[in-house]
């Protein structure tokens, strides 16, 4: 991001009121204001709200990118490339480039206190009330969520594939780690046996044994989710150790928080037409929201039903219909699909439309 901004400095212009702006530089569909004081460039990024960070799933640049994502040969990873605790911190912790509003920070803090059953002081520890949280922090987490984090105690799988941050959304693999049962043509989602929030209570130990499998792929030309991910990610060895345990906990906590924030925003939008119109101008909605909703292991049954409804309609619906589906997904006990056929085999569950694969589900084991 810093290099992107430096590259954009040469394009700085002044608007009608004399303020320096960067009109040709688009990040988060936001405005970038800069000022130069004693040859030091100061910048402020104004965004349109939480949903604007979805746009940052497109190419990002930040300091750790070369270290984390530069090498593709998975068989020749040097010891210096092993993911360090500080690297996980850099991916998960807040950055000062585009501060969250107090409303966003306080909302997330309330979610922490409520869902993790902690008091106000502990909530502040997870979501401090200052300017350190930013949309770019959230977007990096979303990007990792899209990749399908894979953490397990099996020695052969002690790694975390992370998608290349420059990958386009259409090339990403994302996680949909939910179990389903099928009764005729009715799909009934089943939540994981252990809520992910519970894993926060066992002194980080739960994160070492949490297996979030590769998730869902859409129209992937018959290539497995694992193959897709490995093509554009690196394999990071020996992730869960005494040194990295705390960082893994922070990573998982941030993913959980962002999932909760996403759910909260979806519920707010479902009942707020004015905000809905503003978001509609920001992003192509249906498929992006589907990919967002299917990106996290901690999303509940409502989000899973929502994903199935979206796929059943082939994502060709407008935003208001999307929000109606979201509301419906929260009230229905099961989802009846008009054309999907569900098959369970070889460790993955496939939803077929006629002979075309529409949805692959790789269940999570917690």
From Swiss-Prot:
Its main location: host cell. The keyword RNA-binding applies. Residues 1-11 are annotated as: Important for ssRNA-binding and formation of complexes. One of its GO terms (molecular function) is single-stranded RNA binding. It comes from the Viruses. It is found in: Host cytoplasm. InterPro entries: Reovirus_polyG_pol. Keywords: Host cytoplasm, RNA-binding. One of its GO terms (cellular component) is host cell cytoplasm. There is a strain variablity in the inhibition of the host integrated stress response (ISR). There is a correlation with the abilities of the strains to prevent upstream PKR activation and c phosphorylation. Homooligomer; in presence of RNA. Interacts with protein mu-NS; this interaction allows the localization of sigma-NS to the viral factories. Interacts with host G3BP1 (via C-terminus); this interaction induces the relocalization of G3BP1 and other SG proteins to the viral factories periphery. Protein that binds to ssRNA and participates with protein mu-NS in forming the matrix of viral factories, which are large inclusions in the host cytoplasm where replication intermediates are assembled and viral RNA replication takes place. Plays a role in the inhibition of the integrated stress response (ISR) to escape from host cell translational shutoff. Participates in the disruption of stress granules (SG) through its association with host G3BP1 and mu-NS. Belongs to the orthoreovirus sigma-NS protein family. This is Protein sigma-NS. The lineage of its organism: Viruses, Riboviria, Orthornavirae, Duplornaviricota, Resentoviricetes.
């Amino acid at each position: 991001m810093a290099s992107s901004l430096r590259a954009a400095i040469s394009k700085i212009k002044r608007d009608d009121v004399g303020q320096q702006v960067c009109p040709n530089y688009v990040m988060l569909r936001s405005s970038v204001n800069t000022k130069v004081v004693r040859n030091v460039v100061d910048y402020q990024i104004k965004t349109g709200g939480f949903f604007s960070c979805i746009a940052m799933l497109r190419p990002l640049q930040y300091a750790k990118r070369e270290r984390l994502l530069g090498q593709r040969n998975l068989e020749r990873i040097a010891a210096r490339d092993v993911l360090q605790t500080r690297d996980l911190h850099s991916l998960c912790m807040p950055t000062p480039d585009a501060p969250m509003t107090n409303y966003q920070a306080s909302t997330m803090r309330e979610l922490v206190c409520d869902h993790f059953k902690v008091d106000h002081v502990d909530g502040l520890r997870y979501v401090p009330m200052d300017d350190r949280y930013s949309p770019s922090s959230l977007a990096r987490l979303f990007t990792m969520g899209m990749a399908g984090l894979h953490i397990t105690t099996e020695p052969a799988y002690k790694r975390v594939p992370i998608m290349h941050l420059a990958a386009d959304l259409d090339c990403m693999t994302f996680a949909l780690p939910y179990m389903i049962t099928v009764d005729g043509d009715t799909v009934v989602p089943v939540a994981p046996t252990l809520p992910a929030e519970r894993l926060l209570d066992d002194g980080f130990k739960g994160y070492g044994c949490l297996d979030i499998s590769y998730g869902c792929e859409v129209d992937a030309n018959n290539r497995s989710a694992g193959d897709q991910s490995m093509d554009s990610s690196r394999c990071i060895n020996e992730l869960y150790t005494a040194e990295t345990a705390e960082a893994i906990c922070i990573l998982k906590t941030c993913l959980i928080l962002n999932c909760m924030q996403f759910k909260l925003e979806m519920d707010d939008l479902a009942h707020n037409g004015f905000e809905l119109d503003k978001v509609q101008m920001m992003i192509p909605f249906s498929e992006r929201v589907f990919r967002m909703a299917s990106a996290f292991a901690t999303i509940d049954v409502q989000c899973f039903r929502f994903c199935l409804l979206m796929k059943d309609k082939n994502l060709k619906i407008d935003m208001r219909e999307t929000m109606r589906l979201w509301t419906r997904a929260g009230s229905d006990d099961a989802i009846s699909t008009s054309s999907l056929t569900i098959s369970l085999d070889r460790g993955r569950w496939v939803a077929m439309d006629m002979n075309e694969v529409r949805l692959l589900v790789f269940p999570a084991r917690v």
